[in-house]
From Swiss-Prot:
Binds 1 Zn(2+) ion per subunit. HAMAP family: RNApol_bact_RpoC2. It comes from Oltmannsiellopsis viridis. It catalyses: RNA(n) + a ribonucleoside 5'-triphosphate = RNA(n+1) + diphosphate. Pfam families: RNA_pol_Rpb1_4 (PF05000), RNA_pol_Rpb1_5 (PF04998). Keywords: Chloroplast, DNA-directed RNA polymerase, Metal-binding, Nucleotidyltransferase, Plastid, Transcription, Transferase, Zinc. The gene is rpoC2. InterPro entries: DNA-dir_RpoC2_beta_pp (IPR012756), DNA-dir_RpoC_beta_prime (IPR045867), RNA_pol_Rpb1_3_sf (IPR042102), RNA_pol_Rpb1_4 (IPR007083), RNA_pol_Rpb1_5 (IPR007081), Rpb1_funnel_sf (IPR038120). DNA-dependent RNA polymerase catalyzes the transcription of DNA into RNA using the four ribonucleoside triphosphates as substrates. Disulfide bonds: none annotated. Belongs to the RNA polymerase beta' chain family. RpoC2 subfamily. One of its GO terms (cellular component) is DNA-directed RNA polymerase complex. Zn(2+) binds at C286, C359, C366, C369. This is DNA-directed RNA polymerase subunit beta''. GO terms for molecular function: DNA binding; DNA-directed RNA polymerase activity; zinc ion binding.
Length: 1859
């Protein structure tokens, strides 16, 4: 449209050209000079040429020319679009005023409608012309995609790179097509209606046109992820059904988006108006000297808003000089016009101008700080409501902003990367060598990233030189004859090499326009398996990362290749040790795969066929003979039906005990040993099951870690799989944990069953345990973070039990549950019954001293008592305590006992128990006669009890409880030597676990027990109370275990009670005291390592490793690490399982899946000096169990950080009734737990929730105290008796005593009496162990400390108002810790002497183990000695242990569990055990090994683990576990876990006919897609795979899928795992630039203005403030940091609008931002009278500080979002109440008696008054007048109450007076 209109005056015309120099920019239209008819042609040309998108108006002479209008017409021969109209109208306003402008606009409107009526545009379908190049572009893109998919098939690109390339390919295609569409319209038909509409400036743009005639392109799914299926059709062609469905979501989103956008934008505007409505121009000049610096805002390398634009309409805050001419360009307070702005911006990068942000006007802003009113082109007038204008200016364009927030998988190349294409064919040459590095781009291509700027020369190879460079952006290339120079910036990615020939349009390089300014975001993407099969690591580089929770993640640190080899799993209906098939056998549907003989033993007793002396074990009926089981085929895999697959291991059944019993032990069949009790051990695998044998290995072969040689030897010997040796390694990796089920309980639980124990699942033995406790979701109980490692934490003790504990008698200790502590709080009460038993051991001593009932006496006594036989009696007592009464009544036999099923005694006990059981009084009763009575009742029972105890212990480690029983049985068997060995093994295993828990107590505890036992049965009691009863001889055995405990227990403890950890402790031994500390640490370490592998099984393996490593290590605690026990923990919390549910398959499965190893925890436990911490714990207990405050146990605790103690809390739920003794494994890993439930009967309800808090568990890991001390604690418990002597007061002495004596008590004070529980003293008796260790007897004593636990005092209880039974509970907790640790310590000291070693062996880590072992007393004693030695080294540490006692009882149980864990080996090992024991340095260890070859196994410090391996028949160790099937397929456990075999079917293979050609590949080679199979290169592979067979005519491959893992990828599988289709394989991580499109539009604006806590602004402000505080005073720093954050917000907001094409003046945003940044938070009030945390305005604090002499207020700047700022009642409560939260604001204002001065607009509108803006400004406001507020009130009163509302005289009076 050309306009011809007259301007009335010539002057005006010249003003237009002169005054408006850079008037308009016409970028795209040719300008012809002749078009202006009259006037200053030069000026006109200049103004047209220099166009900028908006007008710059020079105000130097505008208004003076509004005189006459000369009617000479000016003809603009121009197409007037929207921009030109804007310029014309602005020019008209500035020169003629509003009246004339309105007339002009009216005329323009008429012309427009007139012309539109004459013309018309029709749009037909034929106008939609599709460019011819589309088909070729799409075909090229599809070809590129084929190449990408082939690369993926070959495994050359990661899934992320593949996705990125697909997306980028289509995005590029779509963009290219869009350009072609526009080009086609331009070249063919400019008047095409579609083209005219697209470029008319009306709604819509090119993207709509692209969809009509190009291709719709990529769409996003509802999550904002790009779907890599592009819509290739356009609307003209029509969409296919798939394309239609995909595009529906995007289309609907557009419609919804618009509706929501309007609402959101409206709400944003409302909030902005509310926050700024009171900002009015109040005065001319606020006299401020401050200002803000304006500069050009850039995004990347592109200018977003130029300095010139930002300067127009501002007022300079200082004189500005031209540096070249040294003349003043602008003086202070001068307005900056468009012309001045242009001059300034040419000479200056930044300019200081006045701003609303720095205005000092008290209420609004002043004219100079605000500057021009942009609508007028002149200074804003007084009284203008600039706040409302600002709010409307920002809110109005909101509807034009998008609502999108998107997260694409990386950024489109078109958005970020500028690509350079070759302008012509040529040879690339670089003039100089470039600095840089090779990188792999996001597309998986290798390219060169330059660090510096550079240039390349493209030498022409063709003659056609012209027009070449139009493909390149002109800024980057300059063409020289024959060559093109391309200059590229730094950080360019080059795709070509020097001397490479390139073709026309080939990509040479790309560079980012956003370098440096953008943060990168780390994203991750899960890759799932594309087929079901076996994971094979072809070329993997892993590093292990451990989090605070000791969770391990395996990351690749280089690009790694893994394969999924196709196969299926065949699930066996029964778990069977025997598999008739071997790997490689061909099978069909009729093949017999395995046979199982199911026997149901009506009696609890099962006999082993093999052993010469058949033992009759009184097992629960559940027991079965597992002899055959031992044959399990390792290769076979079991899958868990439930969620996860698990392998069943024979291990679980260590029944081998019996064999052990036999003297010959070796001779007995492994199978016999299999006899394990009813429970089978099952391992739960992580996702996939591992082959059974592997599992076993884990168990069996701790050697994995390093003792592989040993391992191998033993395996081959005993193991049915000759190859077991090799197996173990892999299995280690795999199995997460083992579970065994006892048949009796099958329904209820399995030995390892973690699930039930969910609560403790998390517990990690080590310090992490407390975390675990938290986790235990199941039990509602407190989720303290009990730090206590597992051991103490268990608290589970039934509440009543706890009381018992307090009783003098150790029996009271029933607390056994505490033992669970290892597990961490979760442990269940299940174990309780068992636990009780544990307690008993102490009892004996206690009994003796019972009348005194004084803790200290006990300690002291302990020494004397040590030798006592009383212990057995105690046992009895404990029994009663042990089972929660409910349990007992329920049929303890069945339930608890069942757990123990192995030992008959349990039943009897049960009865007695019941009597005792009253929970609350339990303690006291026990104490007294009751206890005695029980004793009298049945020693056997005791043994059973013992078993239970073990279970508890197991808790920590694994579900050994059941195993315990078996061990028991063995014990029963007479053959002392052999039997002893067998027992030993079991014991060891238990011990191990226990140790872990007790870490601290390690040294002393274990021994003591053993010692006590060693003399007589009585002693046995101590060791494994139950056991001892059954076999007096056994008692010696018991000793053995005790010893173990002392050995490495510490370390081991960390992991979990069940693990072999003890062995590791052994390693410690060598170190002895110093070792202690180290050990802790190391142990942990090792656990971790192991953990990864085993997850389930790991325990045993780990153990083994330990042993061997141990040996070597002896001093280096390092070896310890081998213990991988923690793996067992893998169970992780399966809260779902109830105790009763233990058996549920589902639960089991879950455990398996957790897969993470718990073990790591073990180490953490270790870390703390367990001893100290433990002891401390005890004290703590006494204190009110504040668990949280570990400090509680101050005296002792002081030592170590109490923190550990917090963990303790966890025992939460004890389940008094639930006797179910679940044994829980505790492990380091949080979340994982293994639990065994012994008593099937227990009802779920049984668990009582104990407060963890009660237990003070103070054990802190740290307590470094003397590490040795720590030992005692755990072991102590059962062993305590024996240990006592060890204790040697000194150790304790320090804190222990204090703690014990009064300290605990202190709180408890009277409670002590019964509660003392100190009965531990009995333990001290144990000190007897003396014989062996000359030094250490005294050491043993320390164990006693355990008692210290507060358990007793009722007072405490009251004090703490824990739950009703708190006291008891607490006690329990203690006990746990005590056991293991003590033992461990001791060991180290002993390690040197072999003899000692032997003894140690006897001791075996877990006292519990004792049962199994009949070992000669001597061995026991030896053990003790060892302990003592250890103690000696760290006497203090032992003291620490004091707390442990309770634990120790529990410990015993765990020991059994351990055995189970190793079960497979267990029985055999046991048998050999005697010999095997080869002593290790640690007392706990059974390094002796002399007798049996198996001994290597023993080597592992964790004797237990070794045991499994030991089985003479290698087979036994593993397979036996498997056999456990005896529970029968019907049993719950079986359903949960079934053995599986991996089978290769015909569908998993592909055969290629090679017709006799020479093959290029050999069997075992991997072939990738497209590889050649034969030398003539004619046969290539259509599917990648592994060559499994080559004949003269055929090559068979096993179909496989390669997966490339980028560095930093997280592995969810291990080598050899079985993985289901779509199961997570790896998680790939990648980084991408964080560009503006991550959060866009309104959400981004809202995020900035609301200053959300989650956003980065608060962090930025805090960082800026901290930085400034280092350079300036705090007050200055606060102001500076607010100024900085103001600039950041302003620039961010402007950028968001600019990115959407909306330009808003800075001053509007500044007014809003000023409201957000006016407050500070008071940090220190000083003498200002302000309150800490109060939000006040910066000005008010600065003013207040000026008048203060003395300490001034300290404050930090804060950001207040607009909603919060609008609710600020200090400004106006009327305005705030009308915005939101009316009632709250009005009531608060009323309470505070606020006055509203009605300064804003809203308040006045609400009250119906004249608003104080515009005309009303002069009437009502005079801010400088001090009496202003009084006048306002007067005015208001007049207005409201006078009949003659505000007369003019009032107004004039007001204005006069105010001025």
């Amino acid at each position: 449209m050309n306009l011809n209109f007259s301007l009335a005056c010539e002057t005006q015309a010249s003003s237009f050209y002169g005054g408006f120099r850079p008037f308009i920019k016409y970028p795209s239209l040719q300008h012809s000079p002749g078009s202006v008819k009259e006037g200053d042609n030069k000026g006109a040309n200049r103004s047209l040429k220099k166009a900028t998108p908006w007008l710059r108006v020079s105000l130097e002479r505008p208004y003076k020319y509004r005189t006459t209008l000369n009617a000479r017409p000016v003809f603009f021969n121009r197409c007037f679009d929207k921009g030109r109209f804007k310029s014309l109208i602005l020019w008209c306003i500035l020169n003629f005023g509003e009246q004339k402008t309105v007339e002009l606009v009216e005329q323009l409107k008429d012309i427009g409608y007139h012309q539109a009526t004459l013309a018309g545009v029709s749009l037909g379908i034929d106008d939609l012309k599709i460019p011819n190049s589309k088909a070729q572009l799409v075909a090229e893109a599809q070809l590129e995609n084929q190449l990408i998919l082939q690369e993926d098939l070959r495994g050359n690109v990661t899934s992320i790179e593949k996705f990125q390339r697909l997306i980028d390919t289509w995005h590029l295609t779509s963009e290219t097509l869009k350009d072609n569409v526009i080009k086609a319209f331009r070249n063919t038909d400019i008047l095409n209606p579609v083209y005219m509409m697209a470029f008319s400036g009306a709604r819509g743009n090119v993207s709509q046109v692209r969809q009509l005639v190009g291709m719709r392109g990529l769409m996003a799914d509802p999550q904002g992820q790009i779907i890599n299926f592009p819509i290739q059709s356009n609307f003209r062609e029509g969409l296919t059904l798939t394309e239609y469905v995909i595009s529906c979501y995007g289309a609907r989103k557009g419609v919804v988006d618009t509706a929501l956008r309007t609402a959101t934008s409206g709400y944003l505007t409302r909030r902005l108006v509310d926050v700024a409505q009171h900002v009015i121009v109040y005065q001319f000049d606020c006299q401020t000297t401050r200002g803000i610096l304006l500069n050009t805002i850039k995004v990347g390398n592109t200018t977003s808003i130029s300095l010139q634009k930002r300067l127009v309409g501002r007022v300079s805050a200082e004189d500005i000089y031209n540096s070249k001419t040294n003349t003043k360009e602008v003086s202070r307070n001068q307005e900056i016009t468009p012309i001045l702005a242009e001059q300034i911006s040419q000479n200056h990068n930044q300019v200081l101008v006045r701003s609303a942000l720095t205005c000092q006007a008290k209420h609004g802003v002043c004219q100079l700080c605000y500057g021009w009113s942009l609508a007028q082109g002149s200074l804003v007038s007084l009284g203008e409501a600039v706040g409302v204008v600002a709010a409307q200016s920002i809110g109005e364009p909101g509807t034009q902003l998008t609502m999108r927030t998107f997260h694409t998988g990386g950024v489109f190349s078109g958005d970020v990367m500028e690509q350079i294409q070759a302008p012509h064919n040529g040879i690339v040459e670089f003039q100089t060598a470039l600095q840089g590095t090779l990188i792999r781009t996001s597309h998986g291509k290798i390219a060169f990233l330059t660090y510096t700027k550079g240039e390349l020369t493209l030498k022409n190879t063709t003659k056609a030189q012209r027009g070449l460079n139009h493909h390149l952006s002109s800024s980057l290339t300059q063409t020289v004859v024959g060559e093109t120079k391309i200059i590229f910036p730094s950080y360019t990615i080059l795709y070509v090499r020097n001397g490479e020939a390139v073709k026309h349009k080939q990509f040479i390089a790309e560079y980012s326009s956003l370098v440096g300014e953008n943060q990168s975001i780390k994203s991750s993407q899960k890759v799932n398996a594309e087929m079901t099969g076996e994971v094979f690591f072809e070329n993997v580089f892993l590093r292990v990362e451990s989090s605070e929770e000791s969770e391990k993640t395996y990351r690749s640190f280089k690009f790694s290749d893994i394969w999924i080899l196709s196969c299926v799993t065949n699930t066996l209906k029964f778990k069977s040790n025997f598999s008739l098939t071997k790997p490689g056998d061909r099978i069909n549907t009729a093949t017999v795969i395995n046979q199982v003989l199911l026997k149901k033993t009506d009696e609890g007793v099962a006999t082993q066929q093999q052993s010469k002396k058949a033992l009759s074990l009184p097992l629960n009926t559940s027991m079965e003979v597992l002899g055959e089981a031992n044959k399990v085929d390792f290769s076979s895999k079991k899958t868990c039906k439930g969620l996860l697959q698990t392998d069943y291991k024979n291990l679980g059944y260590f029944y081998s005990f019996q064999n052990k019993l036999t003297k010959k032990a070796k001779s007995f069949d492994h199978s016999t040993s299999h006899l394990s009790r009813k429970g089978t051990v099952s391992l739960v695998q992580k996702n996939n099951t591992k082959s059974v044998n592997e599992l076993f290995f884990k168990y069996g072969k701790p050697n994995l870690s390093g003792g592989s040689d040993l391992f191998k030897g033993s395996t081959s010997k005993g193991s049915p799989e000759g190859a077991t040796g090799s197996l173990p390694v892999s299995s280690l990796n795999k199995d997460p944990f083992v579970t065994w089920y006892s048949s009796l309980f099958k329904a209820k639980y399995s030995g390892f069953y973690t699930p039930s124990t969910a609560p403790f699942t998390d517990t990690r033995m080590s310090q992490p345990a407390f975390r675990l406790a938290k986790k235990t979701a199941n039990k509602k109980p407190p989720t303290l973070p009990c730090k206590y490692w597992g051991k103490g934490s268990f608290l589970l003790r039934n509440l009543s039990e706890v009381e018992l504990f307090s009783n003098r008698n150790p029996g009271v200790f029933k607390r056994l549950e505490s033992m669970t502590g290892l597990l961490s709080q979760q442990v269940y009460q299940d174990c309780y019954a068992n636990q009780k038993i544990l307690l008993t051991p102490f009892s004996p001593n206690t009994l003796q001293h019972s009348s005194p009932n004084t803790p200290k006496g006990v300690l002291r006594d302990g020494k004397s008592v040590v030798g006592r036989s009383n212990p057995p009696q105690h046992f009895h007592g404990s029994v009663g305590g042990g089972c929660p009464s409910k349990q007992v009544s329920a049929g303890p036999k069945k339930g608890l006992r069942a757990k123990h099923s192995e030992a008959c005694f349990a039943i009897d006990f049960g009865e007695t128990k019941t009597k005792t059981i009253t929970k609350g009084r339990y303690v006291s009763q026990l104490n007294c006669k009751k206890e005695k009575r029980l004793l009298a009742k049945t020693s056997r029972m005791f043994s059973t009890l013992k078993v239970e105890f073990w279970l508890f212990e197991n808790l920590t480690l694994s579900l050994v409880t059941h195993q315990h029983f078996p061990q028991y049985s063995y014990r029963s068997v007479e053959g002392p030597p052999t039997g002893m060995l067998g027992l030993w093994l079991l014991n060891n295993s238990f011990v191990l676990k226990q140790l872990v828990t007790n870490l601290e107590t390690v040294a002393s505890v274990g021994l003591p027990f053993g010692v006590v036992l060693n003399q007589n049965t009585n002693q046995n009691l101590n060791g494994s109370e139950l056991l001892s009863q059954s076999l007096l001889n056994s008692s010696k055995k018991v000793e053995g275990p005790g010893r173990s405990a002392s050995s490495g227990v510490l370390r081991a403890g960390s992991v979990g009670v069940d693990w072999l950890y003890f062995s590791s402790a052994n390693t410690y031994l060598g170190k002895v005291s110093s070792g202690f500390e180290n050990n802790k640490t190391q142990l942990i370490k090792s656990g971790q390592g192991v953990k990864q592998n085993f997850d389930q099984s790991l325990i045993s393996q780990e153990t083994i490793l330990l042993a061997s490593a141990l040996k070597q290590l002896s001093n280096k605690q390092k070896t310890w690490p081998s213990l991988a026990f923690y793996n067992t923990l893998t169970f992780k919390n399966n809260n779902e399982l109830g105790q009763s549910q233990l058996f549920n398959t589902g639960e089991l499965d879950n455990n398996a899946s957790n897969k993470s190893s718990v073990f790591s925890t073990g180490k953490s436990l270790l870390c703390h000096n367990p001893v100290l911490s433990k002891i401390c714990n005890t004290t703590t207990f006494i204190t009110p169990f504040n668990i949280k405050d570990r400090g509680v146990a101050p005296t002792e605790l002081q030592l170590k950080q109490e923190n550990k103690c917090i963990a303790t809390q966890s025992s939460f739920l004890c389940n008094p009734t639930n006797l179910t003794p679940k044994v829980f494994l505790t492990t380091n890993y949080p979340g994982k737990v293994a639990c065994s439930c012994v008593g099937g009967d227990v009802g779920k309800d049984t668990f009582v929730k104990v407060n963890l808090s009660q237990f003070d568990f103070i054990e802190s890991n740290q307590s470094r105290f003397v590490p040795t001390l720590s030992f005692t604690s755990t072991l102590n418990r059962v062993n305590a008796v024996q240990q006592i002597s060890l204790t040697k007061p000194h150790i304790y002495q320090k804190f222990f005593l204090s703690a014990q004596r009064g300290s605990y008590h202190l709180k408890t004070k009277k409670t002590l009496q019964g509660s003392p529980g100190l009965s531990y003293s009995g333990i001290s008796n144990y000190s007897v162990s003396h014989h062996r260790s000359k030094k250490a007897e005294s050491h043993t004593l320390p164990l006693r400390l355990n008692y210290a636990v507060k358990k007793v005092s009722r007072v405490d209880e009251e004090r703490i108002p824990l739950r009703k039974k708190p006291k008891t509970d607490i006690t329990k907790v203690f006990s746990i810790p005590e056991l293991d640790w003590n033992v461990k310590l001791r060991l180290p000291s002993i390690n040197s002497p072999e003899t000692q070693g032997k003894n140690k062996a006897g001791v075996s880590y877990l006292v519990k183990l004792d049962l199994g072992v009949q070992r000669p007393q001597t061995a026991v004693s030896g053990r003790v000695d060892i302990f003592q030695r250890g103690l000696g080294d760290s006497e203090k540490a032992l003291g620490f242990k004091g707390v442990a006692p309770h634990s120790s009882e529990k410990l015993n149980v765990p020991v059994f569990n351990q055995t189970n864990i190793f079960g497979l080996a267990d029985s055999d090992a046991s048998v050999k055990a005697g010999a095997v024991f080869e002593t290790s340095k640690y007392t706990g260890e059974i390094l002796k090994s002399i007798e049996s070859k198996q001994q290597r196994l023993f080597n592992t410090p964790l004797g237990v683990v070794e045991k499994g391996l030991q089985l003479q028949n290698g087979q036994t160790h593993l397979s036996q576990l498997e056999t456990k099937t005896i529970p029968s397929s019907l049993s719950p456990d079986s359903t949960q876990i079934s053995p599986t075999q991996r089978v290769l079917t015909s569908d998993d293979q592909k055969t290629f006919n090679v017709l006799g050609k020479k093959p290029l590949v050999k069997v075992g080679d991997f072939v990738r897609y497209g590889d050649f199979l034969t030398c003539d290169k004619k046969i290539s592979v259509s599917e990648p795979g592994l060559v499994i067979k080559i004949t003269s005519s055929k090559i068979t491959i096993r179909i496989a899928k390669p997966v490339l893992v980028s560095s930093g990828g997280v592995f969810h599988v291990q080598h050899g795992d079985f993985i289901e289709e779509n199961a997570p394989l790896v998680t790939l991580t990648y980084t991408r630039l964080k560009t503006g499109d991550i959060v866009q539009g309104i959400p981004k604006i809202e995020e900035l203005f609301e200053a959300r806590i989650s956003g980065t602004l608060h962090n930025q402000l805090a960082i800026i403030f901290e930085n400034y505080k280092q350079k300036f005073s705090s007050a200055y720093a606060a102001r500076k940091s607010l100024e900085r954050i103001q600039q950041i917000i302003v620039e961010n907001v402007l950028n968001v609008y600019q990115s959407q094409g909306v330009t808003i003046a800075d001053k509007h945003v500044e007014i809003i931002v000023r409201q957000m940044t006016s407050k500070v938070r008071i940090l220190e009030s000083g003498r200002s009278g302000l309150l800490r945390g109060e939000l006040v305005t910066l000005e008010s604090v600065e003013n207040a500080n000026k008048s203060i002499h003395g300490q001034k207020a300290e404050y930090a700047p804060v950001l207040v979002g607009i909603t919060k700022a609008a609710l600020d009642i200090d400004k106006s409560f009327i305005s705030a109440a009308s915005f939101q939260e009316t009632t709250r604001i009005l009531s608060r204002a009323a309470i505070e008696r606020k006055t509203d001065f009605l300064r804003g607009l809203k308040e006045n509108v609400i009250l119906g008054q004249l608003i104080p803006a515009g005309t009303g400004f002069s009437v009502s406001f005079s801010p400088e007048d001090p009496n202003h507020s009084k006048k306002v009130v007067k005015l208001v009163n007049q207005y409201l109450f006078s009949s003659d509302n505000l007369t003019s005289s009032t107004f004039s009076h007001m204005s006069r007076s105010s001025h």
